């Protein structure tokens, strides 16, 4: 519902991560202590009981977060299959969604358990390359199909209030926007998928460089999916397809992308899915 106003999430992630990269606040001190996780620091600072409590809270948050990503990834695959092959039962059955989720999770579990850290590093790099190609092609085809200026014009027509399209303070309010900045900062410091990488690097200076470069990727990974979602909304004239907004983007991609490019994009999204979950499995194993 926020359209281009939702870009503020990526912008704040950029600002927060860039600030950490420049100053080294918190993360450099943690690296100097040579801890491998936030709960390990809790034990040094507060004692074993606090470490256990902190680990439990992080594990609960990780399970809930991973479950959300798992379902969204399966919905994307479900939407692609339903739109491409016209299989109605794929679109309607919740049990099929569970089967897709299980298959995807088993795939990730197998190569993560068998390959360990090396498999995660190598596959994450390959998946990043494939994902970058897929997203760039999807953006180019979206602009070609809809027209650059037409995207903005149509969005202002379809939106109930044109002011809400660009201004997050209008669409969400100042408190929510401020909270997003705090959330971006805290996530970059204590969330295991971010901090585990930092604490595994060879020196505090390398940690700062990692955050500096990561700030750019944080911005891009929020903006491009949001942009594709906006294009899907415009393509279907603001009508929710199948009663589920999560189905709009995969159905939109099936409509506008040629067969070969669609295959690259599906591979890219599966790569993003697998990259997320193998990192989650590895990072939460340190907790």
Positions of PLM-derived features:
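Loop-to-helix junctions at membrane interfaces in multi-pass transport proteins
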Residues: 1-9, 43, 84-98, 129-263
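Helix-loop-helix module between adjacent transmembrane segments
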Residues: 6-112, 180-184, 270-279
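A generic alpha-helix surface/boundary motif
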Residues: 24, 36, 71, 75, ...
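Re-entrant/interfacial helical elements at transmembrane boundaries that shape
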Residues: 280-287
């Amino acid at each position: 519902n926020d359209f281009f106003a939702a870009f503020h999430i990526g912008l704040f992630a950029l600002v927060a991560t860039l600030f950490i990269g420049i100053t080294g606040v918190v993360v450099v001190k943690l690296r100097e202590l040579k801890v491998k996780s936030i709960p390990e620091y809790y034990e040094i600072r507060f004692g074993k009981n606090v470490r256990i409590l902190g680990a439990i809270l992080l594990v609960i948050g990780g399970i809930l977060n991973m479950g959300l990503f798992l379902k969204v990834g399966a919905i994307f695959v479900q939407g692609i299959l339903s739109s491409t092959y016209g299989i109605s039962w794929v679109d309607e059955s919740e049990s099929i969604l569970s089967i897709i989720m299980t298959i995807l999770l088993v795939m990730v579990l197998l190569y993560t358990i068998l390959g360990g850290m090396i498999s995660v590093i190598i596959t994450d790099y390959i998946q990043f390359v494939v994902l970058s190609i897929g997203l760039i092609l999807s953006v180019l085809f979206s602009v070609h199909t809809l027209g650059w200026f037409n995207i903005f014009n149509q969005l202002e027509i379809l939106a109930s209030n044109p002011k809400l399209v660009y201004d997050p303070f209008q669409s969400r309010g100042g408190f929510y926007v401020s909270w997003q900045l705090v959330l971006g900062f805290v996530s970059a410091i204590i969330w295991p998928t971010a901090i585990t990488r930092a604490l595994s690097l060879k020196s505090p200076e390398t940690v700062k460089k990692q955050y500096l470069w990561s700030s750019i990727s944080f911005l891009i990974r929020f903006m491009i999916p949001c942009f594709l979602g906006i294009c899907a909304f415009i393509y279907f004239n603001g009508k929710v397809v199948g009663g589920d907004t999560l189905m709009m983007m995969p159905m939109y991609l099936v409509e506008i992308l040629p067969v070969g490019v669609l295959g690259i994009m599906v591979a890219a999204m599966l790569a993003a899915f697998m990259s997320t979950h193998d990192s989650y499995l590895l990072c939460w194993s340190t907790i």
